[in-house]
């Protein structure tokens, strides 16, 4: 049965750049909002499935960190 999960994600590159009082490069396509944890809701069969799907949407190779994942319904 498909369930709804809340996933918290931030971007380590954005976070470290902004917290060291540097400007994000103009080539950066990631919102500065990702300095903090952003919560999104996604549908998945299990927590593992939700994390797997989130890893494609928020790739580690681009600095994203999945900080939180919990079933909400």
Predicted regions and their residues:
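A generic structural signal for short, solvent-exposed coil/turn residues
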Residues: 1, 32-34, 58
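A short, structured loop/turn motif at beta-sheet edges
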Residues: 1-5, 43-48
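Short N-terminal "domain-start" leader segments
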Residues: 1-26
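Compositionally biased, intrinsically disordered low-complexity segments
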Residues: 12, 40-41, 69
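Short, low-complexity, polar/charged sequence segments that are solvent-exposed and flexible
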Residues: 25-30, 59-63
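A short, exposed loop/beta-hairpin motif centered on an aromatic-Gly-Thr core
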Residues: 28-45
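Short, mixed-charge low-complexity intrinsically disordered segments
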Residues: 47-73
